[in-house]
Amino acid sequence: MVNESLNQEESNDRPVPESEFQADTSYSTQPSVSIHPSVSGHPSVSIHPSVSGHPSVSIDPSVSVHPSSSAHPSTLAQPSGLTHPNELVKEDSVIKVSKRRWAVVLVFSCYSLCNAFQWIQYGSINNIFMNFYGVSAFAIDWLSMCYMLTYIPLLLPVAWMLEKFGLRTIAITGSALNCLGAWVKLGSLEPHLFPVTMVGQVICSVAQVFILGMPSRIASVWFGANEVSTACSMAVFGNQLGIAIGFLVPPVLVPNIKDQEKLAYHISIMFYIIGGVATLLFILVIIVFKEKPKYPPSRAQSLSYALATTDASYLSSIVRLFKNLNFVLLVITYGLNAGAFYALSTLLNRMVIMHFPGQEVNAGRIGLTIVIAGMFGAMISGIWLDKSKTYKETTLVVYIMTLVGMVVYTFTLNLNHLWIVFITADSLGFFMTGYLPLGFEFAVELTYPESEGVSSGLLNVSAQVFGIIFTISQGQIIDNYGSVPGNIFLCVFLALGSALTAFIKSDLRRQRANKDAPETKVQEEEEEEEESNTSKVPTVLSEAHL
């Protein structure tokens, strides 16, 4: 390609679609053609000095332009990065998916797993840390709730950073903070050092802000139109698996013993393991993460490149989102469901120990059952959405079944049969945890082409707010009245969420963007392949696509 810097005074010339340029047969395709005898140039192409256009114009070296051509000068090339949206969805647009996308979503899932483990590692053995640090149950609850509290004020700055600096910067920052927080906790292995473990947990909670809004963004930027829901489910899958491991591993690594020195030793093993894993994942993020693939993976993503502008008002995007009634309803309903899950996860150990004293390990296994079942629910619902596109219907059914599962769990917990609790926890988790990625994807559909980082961030703020309210309220109800009234409290709000979900309209804007454009075969990108075919005019891509 030959890049010519042309006169700026004609920079406002209308950019003509590449199809016009290729169709004009008055342009010679013979190499080494001189355009005007008085003008000399590159051996393979000469350009008359009167031809002007936008800066950084890409011109195929095999094309020469005769001054007598009747075409407008701006048809000679497509300005770099200044393509109209309707031109981006023409038939010859390059739409490819990158093989790297699987590595990106896998690494993200792993460090999201690590961060989620650190969130629940205290709550899953609440009574053991109470005895070790000599603090109240409410103080240990704050090791969980600090994740929720930190997210609320930091959402908008981090979402702005995601738009400003992109996926790679946010991923590196989140994994670095996650690693730092894990190592800080190693300085809290004495009973009087509870403030140090709180500082480490707060650092990890800040890392979470750089993680929770990423799944839908990664899915949209890296995956094709028929993969986005599955990819989003895979990204959320890591966070859920981290919670599952956080329920299972701490009760095994840290037994309920009275000897403080031995207890400190067991806690240190857990902290060292998580510190080493967090460090390894930080290195992998640096190696694997790229800002975006070489080519857009879908027409909707290609169009979003065109609509994105550097001077776009970030606050105006948020204002537009809150004017979208369907999205506002989803924010509320998502917060109610996810907030109930956060409260249930935080207080699960306390509820199980109340009915089954000395069963810390089984309390962790019940939590594991809830999350593992939810992971299967998330994957199944993600695959179903990619096939059926029934976002509203699927979300509503899953929400109602979450309510049913919570009611059954509530009234079987006090039957004093542990195997029944495992069964009801499994059914509850399948729908309650499986709902989380549905909310992300439904939000992107309702708000397209607004930023996925902003929409998913607002969903998470709602989840954190309701999570704090529900955790504190249910904790007080359990302490004063028992587990059944505490769980009924959550059932009431899940019923409200189910009713509100029914009023959300199925306005699938991203699906319309993909369907409105002509079909293009999505190819698998061969990243190592060099573009060696210069015998024909290639599709011109703006620099934003590379």
Curated annotation (Swiss-Prot):
Any one Gene Ontology BP term: sprouting angiogenesis
Low complexity composition-biased segments: 54-74
Residues recorded as bearing Phosphoserine in the entry: S535
Residue numbers on the Extracellular membrane side: 119-136, 187-193, 254-258, 356-359, 414-416, 481-482
Regions crossing the membrane: 94-118, 137-164, 167-186, 194-222, 228-253, 259-288, 325-355, 360-388, 391-413, 417-446, 455-480, 483-505
Compartments where located: Cell membrane; Mitochondrion membrane; Endoplasmic reticulum membrane
Biased composition (Basic and acidic residues): 511-523
GO cellular component terms attached to this protein's record: endoplasmic reticulum membrane; membrane; mitochondrial membrane; plasma membrane
Region (9 X 6 AA tandem repeats of P-S-[VS]-S-[VIAG]-[HD]): 31-84
UniProt domain comment: The N-terminus contains histidine-proline motifs involved in heme binding. Can bind 2 to 3 heme molecules.
Name recorded for this polypeptide: Choline/ethanolamine transporter FLVCR2
